[in-house]
């Protein structure tokens, strides 16, 4: 009987121990699930190298800043050697961009006006008052479009089964929805699939994304600044897409020893302690952000005389630029650059600084031409300015 009691006691003890272990295991699993569901803490590796700490490449940085000041410029194409900071610079944008207002929780980043226009259209519902719509401030989205992305990933998908069974348009937004009112970045854009290029061209022209599946149609705003980067040695960009970029920035490997040493030191310091490095440059980051906001506020007050506009038209005509995107882009970019410089009036000094960015990718290609595109633009600018001075 004693043996039986001992056996029962042992069995009970074993069960209790097993139950305790199981309880510990379940608790650990529940804890793990809870931790996964919580927003992950910002890891050191998630921090992007700060914009203001990037050495050199002023042309690329200016192009991006001008597009922040006036998104109507039409984006930036950055072409240059590998490892020159193209992707790093674009991804650093997020930290210096001003916050923008949107309807709270809106997947399309819509303004109150866009929300009211879309939600009330054709529904016969009572008018929505702007003061009834809750808003929030968010960072300007900077979205990556990977080369291997499918059309559904880019444009979004419609759940046909749910739409047919419940009558609800179940739409899963794509990258175009996420990038509305922000930046859409394509690394190695010259290697992008032709079909996706066609999609981007259509959306860039209309400012809207339309997804149609089995007779069901969804449309939403998709206005974004298109930023592409690539290495010209890996392939040319399709002319149709090339012309859609407002500015074209060229970057090369820095050949100044002191600057190269500085780049290595800054990068090592950032990699060792990203948070400390970000604190170190926070004042410069804030200073840049304030200057961008000031330029955005000044932009509507910037004016341009007809004489300057005439010189811009002459420049584009003398260079044989096809169409009128050249004049439009120079005009918008010159206004943005004047605002960036704190000036309320555009002069040919401003035009001279940004003409190469606006026109070099629009010049007709001549295989026998030995003159660099930048030199050609500078030469024609000198002629136009000389004629203007002579006329004066």
UniProtKB/Swiss-Prot annotation:
ATP binds at residues 80-87. It comes from Chlorobaculum tepidum (strain ATCC 49652 / DSM 12025 / NBRC 103806 / TLS) (Chlorobium tepidum). One of its GO terms (molecular function) is ATP hydrolysis activity. Residues 1-17 have a biased composition (Low complexity). Belongs to the Mg-chelatase subunits D/I family. It catalyses: protoporphyrin IX + Mg(2+) + ATP + H2O = Mg-protoporphyrin IX + ADP + phosphate + 3 H(+). One of its GO terms (biological process) is photosynthesis. It comes from the Bacteria. Its EC number is 6.6.1.1. Pathway: Porphyrin-containing compound metabolism; bacteriochlorophyll biosynthesis. InterPro entries: AAA+_ATPase, CHLI-like, ChlI/MoxR_AAA_lid, Mg_chelatase_ATPase-isu, Mg_chelatse_chII-like_cat_dom, P-loop_NTPase. Keywords: ATP-binding, Bacteriochlorophyll biosynthesis, Chlorophyll biosynthesis, Ligase, Nucleotide-binding, Photosynthesis. Residues 1-21 are annotated as: Disordered. This is Magnesium-chelatase 38 kDa subunit. Involved in bacteriochlorophyll biosynthesis; introduces a magnesium ion into protoporphyrin IX to yield Mg-protoporphyrin IX. The gene is bchI. Transmembrane segments: none annotated.
